[in-house]
Amino acid sequence: MIQPQTLLNVADNSGARELMCIRILGASNRRYANIGDVIVAVIKEAVPNMPLERSEVIRAVIVRTRKELKRENGMRIRYDDNAAVVIDQEGNPKGTRVFGAIARELRELNFTKIVSLAPEVL
């Protein structure tokens, strides 16, 4: 469950290290975002000499949350951190690598490029 003002780690090599959620895209008054939701975020920490800089507003898709994700078969999956992948306007990742495991639900939400870059899909 990600809400505005939540800090997230960045799970790719786009140049950003930490994001802060400022808006959840979708309905006009969504309170929380889960895995697979697109958010508007601001970069709080960035790697020097990279295209993305601090205080830049970007879009990202959430790939891991500490709040457990309940699947239809009854299984619950929980990760150690809140993480997102930086995307462009078309939904393609800005980085060329994705770090850490991501949820299988991203494939059903048409983020297949992110799923193909991930080392592990749970």
Swiss-Prot record:
Organism domain of life: Eukaryota
SUPFAM superfamilies named among the record's database cross-references: Ribosomal protein L14
Main location: plastid
Pfam families: Ribosomal_L14 (PF00238)
GO term, biological process aspect, one: translation
Keyword rRNA-binding attached: yes
Record key words, sorted: Chloroplast, Plastid, Ribonucleoprotein, Ribosomal protein, RNA-binding, rRNA-binding
InterPro entries the record matches: Ribosomal_uL14, Ribosomal_uL14_bac-type, Ribosomal_uL14_CS, Ribosomal_uL14_sf
MF GO annotations: large ribosomal subunit rRNA binding; structural constituent of ribosome
Subcellular location: Plastid, Chloroplast
CC terms in the record's Gene Ontology section: chloroplast; cytosolic large ribosomal subunit
Cross-referenced CDD domains: Ribosomal_uL14
Function per UniProt: Binds to 23S rRNA.
Subunit structure: Part of the 50S ribosomal subunit.
Family: Belongs to the universal ribosomal protein uL14 family.
Protein name, as recorded: Large ribosomal subunit protein uL14c
Organism in which the protein naturally occurs: Lemna minor
